[in-house]
Amino acid sequence: MCVKHIKKAIKDGEIPKGALREIRITPTRECLDTSDNQALSLMKTSFIERSCLMNSCRTASTLNIPCCEGVAFIIPEGGATVEGGWIRHCWNKKNGYYFDVTREYAMSVPVKEMYYFMIEEHKSIEYEQQLQSTGGIEFISKAVKFSDILNNYDG
């Protein structure tokens, strides 16, 4: 279902071809070495639901790794709802593996499946500079625009 939305949005010219790349998320403990897992275990209770960008930026800054911006399609466990299914989302990458601290440590909605489509990677310094100049952080990529577009397709 989610790939149908993307194909239609590309066909309609709403999203450029090649702008989204499906990626696979690996459990955090499988992506990180012992010292990184220890650093993350000290942080994980402070991760906040619906704050994926902040959670990913803090992880990136602590572990010196990139933030990955994109969109995700959520299929909740029986009966729970997620507005539209598509969300703008941010996760991390280390040694070629993608992992999502927000899903693992902060989401309260039980998720049956979650599909990830990456737009761009950014260094944590880019967000730190944004924070210093504007007082906040926002998605740098077109993740917000693309999630809005995809939520308007019926598939």
Explain the meaning of each model-derived region.
Residues 1-155:
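A structural boundary/capping signal
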